[in-house]
Amino acid sequence: SLTPMSIMAIVATNLKRGQCIQYEGERGVVLGLEHRTPGKGNALIAATIRSFKTGKTKTIRFASSEKVDIVETDRQKLEFSYSEPGTYHFMDPTTYDTIGIDEDFVGDAKNFIKEGQVIEILFIEGNPVSIDLPDTVELEITESSEGIKGDTANNPTKPAVLETGLTVQVPLFVKQGDIIKVSTKDNGYLGRAN
């Protein structure tokens, strides 16, 4: 039986990054907060929020004394075990329980998740609503052509396929078997891992 979702109202000035709120009929996670005091006006809180439904971010302005509905969430650190068509399987490292998460929900995060990696997944009422990836991940290059010798004009790059299947542009000196750092924000190459 479904219990009513735990929601509590707090004053906007007490909002914190990472909290989940209900707003304009949607739910989302607070990514950033900015306190603004325009001229003689009242103080405002500009909250950058990512919608769980659409994945899009937008800025919502609250009066600092305005009440905001906080949704109770459960943040779990889960280890990626394996995937099969349609489902990604994660394990709770403390209880060893496994949980299957729909591939559509995992979305582009699959490009950055490898077996044995621990990531944070946010749940509301037992349903996953958000995957929190680290800003950078280290992945092995499984396929890459040799760079063309003498081609050094304008920082040339070449495509490389990583162990997750993601293709990124890398400098010519990087080779198959290298482990590189990749940005989860823009798929950018950030250097070789030590």
Residue spans for each PLM region:
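Short, Lys/Arg-enriched N-terminal segments with co-localized hydrophobic residues
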Residues: 1-7
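Acidic-enriched and Gly/Ser
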Residues: 7-194
